[in-house]
């Protein structure tokens, strides 16, 4: 686990700029793949995605009766796992830009008490200040147009002392991670074309290639106002789990 101190000042210019794709383009793309999203996630991750998701939920440190926000919630699995931790007395909200993905989540988990899903923009979350104990985002940060603003909105939505967590695909460093990068670059587009969604999975590859290093993401989180920022590489560094704390106000 790698950490940066709370008073760390990143060197050099820093914009926190994110994905260049427009919100409309991203929304339409995810609407189109909503029905295939979960299966494709399993294939693309070589069946590792459920394990990574468990690590994210564990790190949130939620207790029964707690509350959580899941940003870029997709088909709702992370939010559902968070709800299983807080129980019927707790509250979990999933927010996603795509109406198609949100509809899948709403249908799938409509009978779960304390669990809800809304269409919303991560750049302007439909939440009150300090509303939740924790906020998560899994494989969604690289789709945002401004990473710093995304983290800042998550931090705004979490109470002082609460956690903000980000699970995302990382740049390759280990041999295993380099193999997985080859998998993403060469095999994932083929899987997408076979599934009839070639452009969408070509976008996936480009967004992974453009995503900053784990060290840079940690700096951006600190710039967004989070403290005790740290990150852990999972499965040989294929993905990284970033964690930060909302400071006491």
Listing of model-derived features with the role each one plays in the protein:
Residues 227, 233-249:
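Core SAM-dependent methyltransferase catalytic element
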């Amino acid at each position: 686990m790698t950490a940066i101190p709370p008073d760390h000042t990143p060197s050099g210019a820093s914009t926190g700029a994110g994905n260049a794709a427009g919100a409309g383009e991203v929304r339409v793309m995810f609407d189109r793949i909503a029905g295939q999203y979960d299966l494709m996630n399993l294939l693309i991750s070589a069946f590792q995605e459920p394990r990574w998701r468990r690590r994210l939920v564990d790190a949130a440190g939620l207790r029964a009766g707690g509350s959580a926000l899941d940003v870029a919630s997709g088909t709702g699995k992370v939010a559902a796992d968070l709800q299983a931790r807080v129980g019927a007395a707790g509250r979990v909200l999933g927010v996603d830009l795509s109406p198609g993905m949100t509809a899948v989540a709403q249908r799938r988990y409509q009978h779960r008490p304390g669990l809800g899903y809304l269409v919303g923009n991560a750049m302007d979350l439909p939440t009150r200040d300090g509303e939740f104990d924790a906020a998560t985002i899994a494989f969604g940060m690289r789709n945002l147009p401004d990473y710093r603003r995304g983290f800042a909105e998550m931090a705004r939505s979490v109470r002082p002392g609460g956690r903000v967590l980000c699970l995302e695909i990382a740049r390759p460093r280990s041999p295993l991670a380099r193999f997985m990068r080859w998998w993403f670059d060469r095999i994932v587009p083929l899987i997408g074309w076979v599934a009839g969604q070639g452009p969408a999975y070509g976008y996936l590859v480009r967004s992974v290639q453009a995503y900053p290093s784990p060290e840079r993401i940690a700096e951006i989180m600190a710039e967004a106002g989070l403290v005790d920022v740290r990150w852990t590489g999972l499965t040989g560094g294929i993905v990284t789990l970033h964690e930060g704390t909302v400071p006491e106000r």
